[in-house]
Swiss-Prot record:
Its EC number is 4.2.1.77. It is an enzyme of class 4 (lyase). It comes from the Bacteria. The active site is at 91 (proton acceptor). GO terms for molecular function: 4-hydroxyproline epimerase activity; trans-L-3-hydroxyproline dehydratase activity. This is Trans-3-hydroxy-L-proline dehydratase. Substrate binds at residues 92-93, 250, 255-256. Belongs to the proline racemase family.
Length: 334
């Protein structure tokens, strides 16, 4: 056996959505900011993403993360997230998983019963709080970047369907649409059709307009499409599934997507500051969200959302790359 690369990871999940934290085998990542570091990874380290996200080591729905030194003087650390299509700008379930793994494995030092973390992400600064007993994390909450409605009631015409979507930012840009527009429910049976519509809507919007953050050039494009539905759980407010990247299905309620959804509900007067919003996902998992404060991003009214969830470690792994293997960089099916 020949080995050219060895990577170590800690894997976890949040409401079924995986996160693979790469703990060994990562070379130096250059850049002063997390956006610059993300750009560096896109240009120089995409092979690492393919090796660890793609089959046979990963799968179409795999999500990953690299923990970096902080980019700002007051942050505790930085994060860079990856998926089946590339490198994302922020990931809410990823924040929940990183904090949980960091505390439960002793990677992060904690004192008392609640710990605050300041995290640099490509989308901006994120503040997270962990509640734990001993080495077991009970929940993680994070204050996300300012989230806002970019455009509302955007008309869409695809095939014989005409409908409207809201476009909102919650760390990445999302199009929000009701699943009933297509006669679909957010469940496993309708998931293939929802995936197809997610791709169509994303491509339609990006062919008609440029979606770009008013302050950060590197934050642009539709990351995902949120399909909203009536909840199944008695305590849930709404049910959703997010289709993002290259048709990837978010098993969790989607942290940045929930932030974008909170922004749309607040803008419409449906959700008030301090009111609890329970977002249910296709696996029946839930995130708790609320509006902490109201602010502005350039000319847009924005909210600072707080999202709460929990994560569980699923494994500790060591992956190798054999240079003789024709599939050593991986492949994707589905």
């Amino acid at each position: 056996m020949k080995v050219s690369k060895v990577y170590t990871t800690i894997d976890a999940h949040v409401a079924g959505e995986p996160l693979r934290i790469i703990t060994g085998g990562v070379p130096e990542i250059k850049g002063e900011t997390q956006l610059e570091r993300r750009a560096y990874c896109m240009e120089h380290l995409d092979h690492l993403r393919e090796i660890l996200m793609y089959e046979p080591r990963g799968h179409h729905g795999m999500y990953g993360c690299i923990i970096t030194p902080p980019a700002s003087a007051h942050a505790d650390f930085g994060v860079l997230f990856m998926h089946n299509e590339g490198w994302s700008t922020m990931c809410g379930h990823g924040i929940i998983a990183v904090i949980t793994v960091g505390i439960e494995t002793g990677m992060f030092e904690v004192t008392g019963e609640k710990q605050k973390f300041i995290i640099d992400s490509p989308a901006g600064e994120v503040i997270a709080y962990a509640t734990y007993r001993g080495s077991e994390v009970e929940s993680v909450s994070f204050e996300n970047v300012p989230s806002f409605v970019y455009k509302k009631d955007v008309p869409i015409k695809i095939d014989d369907y005409e409908f409207q979507v809201d476009i909102a930012f919650g760390g990445a840009f999302y199009a929000v649409v009701d699943s009933k527009e297509f006669g679909l429910k957010v469940d496993f049976n309708d998931l293939p059709a929802i995936q197809t519509w997610g791709g169509k809507i994303k491509h339609y919007i990006e062919s008609k307009m440029e979606v770009k953050h008013p302050l950060e050039e590197g934050l642009k494009g539709i990351y995902g499409v949120i399909f909203s539905d009536e909840p199944k759980g008695k305590d849930a407010t709404l049910r959703n599934v997010t289709i993002f990247a290259d048709g990837q299905v978010d098993r969790s309620p989607c942290g940045t997507g929930t932030s974008a959804r909170i922004a749309t509900l607040f803008e419409k007067g449906i959700l008030q500051k301090g009111e609890i919003f329970i977002h249910e996902c296709i696996t029946e998992g839930k995130f708790e969200g609320e509006v902490l404060s109201v602010t502005a991003v350039h000319t847009y009214e924005a909210v600072v959302p707080k999202i709460t969830g929990n994560a569980f470690i699923t494994g500790f792994h060591q992956f190798v790359v054999d240079p003789r293997d024709d599939l050593n960089r991986g492949f994707l099916l589905g």
